[in-house]
Each structure stands twice: as C-alpha cells, then as structure tokens.
Regions:
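A boundary/linker detector
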Residues: 1-57, 74-78, 132-275
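Sequence/structural segment immediately N-terminal to covalent heme-attachment motifs in c-type
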Residues: 59-65
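Active-site/pore-lining binding-face segments in mid-to-C-terminal subdomains
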Residues: 94-156
Length: 275
C-alpha cells in the first residue's frame, strides 16, 4: 500500500529522480537505499546469474569485509546472521536499475532497515518473525545511523527512504513511530512520480546486459505477487531470462567471478556451502 498524501504532507519529504551508492569508504548511506521499483521485482541478480555465481560473489564480499557489517560495523557471532545484499544505482527518469556489487550486511540492517517494504508486509500478515518490536528496532537503528552520518558529514542531508512512513498507517506502530521520528528529527525522500519512466521502459542492468521488466503493467505485477510472491515469481522468470540473454560471460562483473576456485580457497574464501 502506498503512502498517502496526507501522511507525506506532515513530514519533510524530498523528491528525487536518482539514487546512487556512496563513493567513499563510509558506507553508512546504504542504510537509506530505496526499495527496488516494482517493474524490476523478480529480476534479482542472485536468480539471473545463478546460485554458483551468486554464492561466489557474496562469499567474496564476506571475506573482504571480514564478516563485518559494512553499514553499522557489527560482526555477528553466528555467521548465519551476516547476509549479502545487492548495491544498485537507480535512475527513475530512465527507468534503469544498475547492479553494482554485493556487500556484507548484518541481519538487523538488512531485514529491519533495508527491506522495509517486506517487513511491513509480513508484519501486517502476522508473521511471527516480524513482530512490532523488530520493526521498531530496525527503524530506530536506521535513524541513529543516519543522524550520526549527517553529524560526521555536515551538509550531507542523508534521508530515510519513505517506506518507513508506511509504518504510520498501522495502528500498532503509529504512536511509537511518531515518537521515533520526532526524537531523531527524521527527514525522508521518495521517487518523483511525475518524472518516473513508463512501466514498460524499466529494466535491470548487469554489466552490458539489460533485463526488461517481466510484467506488462502494474496489474500483471500485482497478480504475480498475489499468486506466488516475489520469490516464486523470480524462479519462474529465471528460465525465460536465461533464454533471452543466453551465451557469453558478464565481463563487467567483479573480477572475482573469473578467478579460479583454488585461488579463492587459498585466500580463505570458501564457496562450497550456503552459509
């Protein structure tokens, strides 16, 4: 459910036409990355590139980061609590989502701060893994990181993606979220809908390859989500995408993709399992 204009009007929400990851070593801004535009749902690199390639990429990201969250600096005792997530740049006017790389992120930053759209949906469905306490913990975690980043970088004006405003539409969350927004003086941003590319123009770019939206329109997207959910839809799309763009190697991807497994093992990067 989209954020209502009435809710948006009560807060400082900046309209943007692009989003790009930070260029320096400070990766805290990744906590504010936007949700993937609906037309490109189901086009996850982990699906399109296959399990072997995806596992190699994320294992490399874990090793490079020393199993430490590249956003908040946490190093989970249980390595199953560190995840791999995609970094994208998004051009809303051109309708292009460009895959950049995979980075190491802790479970709280990943599930409670980045995947906010999924979090609010599962909370509404009563999923026991997404209770009220977890959503609020994720929100406050994100707000703290953004405040600290702005203090360290005067004039940065890093903002929270507008999905957190959806929390205000839940009776069980509204009062606590209003308190957190006031406490941290949170500012938001969202896509400028008036300048958005048409639905059929959206695509996901991986290197020189472009994967077009698999949905004819928003109605088709809704039907697909209702029938199987995004994960199942992605699986069904995989064969079709491989047929459209078969052959060749994604040369522009991280050089790690072409490095022999034995070299990775020597560096302590084990890609033999799915941890």
């Amino acid at each position: 459910m989209a954020v209502t204009k009435k809710i948006i009007s009560q807060y400082d929400v900046k309209l943007v036409t692009k989003w790009a990851p930070p260029e320096g070593d400070d990766l805290r801004p990744l906590i504010a990355m936007p949700n993937i535009p609906k037309p490109t749902h189901g086009l996850a690199p982990r699906t399109l590139l296959g399990a072997t390639t995806w596992n190699r990429m994320r294992k490399y990201a874990y090793a490079k980061a020393d199993d430490t969250c590249e956003i908040c600096g946490a190093k989970p005792e249980n390595l199953r609590h560190r995840h791999g997530h995609e970094v994208y740049s998004i051009d809303y006017e051109k309708g292009t989502v460009t895959f950049q790389r995979v980075f190491c992120v802790c479970a709280l930053c990943h599930l409670g701060c980045i995947h906010t759209g999924r979090a609010i949906t599962l909370f509404r469905q009563g999923n026991p893994l997404y209770p009220k306490e977890f959503l609020l913990e994720g929100a406050e975690h994100a707000f703290k990181i953004i405040n600290e980043y702005n203090k360290d970088h005067p004039g940065a004006d890093l903002r929270v993606y507008r999905t957190f405003l959806d929390y205000l539409k839940c009776d069980d969350l509204r009062e606590d979220m209003e308190r957190l927004i006031e406490k941290y003086q949170v500012k938001f941003y969202e896509e400028d809908s008036k300048k958005m590319a048409k639905w059929g123009d959206w695509k996901l770019a991986i290197g020189s390859k472009e994967y077009p939206t698999p949905y004819e329109n928003e109605k088709a997207w809704k039907e697909a989500m209702e029938k199987q959910g995004e994960k199942d839809t992605a699986r069904l799309l995989q064969k079709n995408m491989e047929e459209k763009f078969s052959g060749g190697v994604y040369d522009e991807l991280n050089a790690i993709l072409n490095e022999p497994v034995e070299n990775l093992n020597k560096k302590g990067i084990d890609i033999s399992n799915n941890e």
